[in-house]
Amino acid sequence: YPKITIVDIKYANDALKAADDIKATLQAYPNLKGIFASNEGAAIGLAVAKKETGSKVVAIGYDSGKTQKDAIMDGTLLGSITQNPVGIGECVVNSLAKAIKGEKLEKILDTGFYWYDKSNIADPKVAAVLYD
């Protein structure tokens, strides 16, 4: 994506640290268009920072949890990406069975994921992989 510039990368799985880091980033880059928070704690921190600063930045999270789902429903977060634990479990069991038989395993295994937002958060297939 040549027209996208990554201005900073921070790591925080703690919501309070993430909120502080994101508020500082929003202050340093007032024209920032979007932020991706790569775990539940960071996504909660992103929602908090957006609410506390009044920022209009597009906010995307990862995983789920009640606070993150609520932030999607109230429009603070546009949506999130969640893992597919059923797909992960199926992939692990199938890979173990192949390994036991001495079969070659793929180097890359896609266990699946879901994008969810207001429009599909209640879809049974999506809701089944979300947690509170």
Where are these regions (language model features)?
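A residue-level marker of the well-folded mature domains of exported/periplasmic proteins
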Residues: Y1-D132
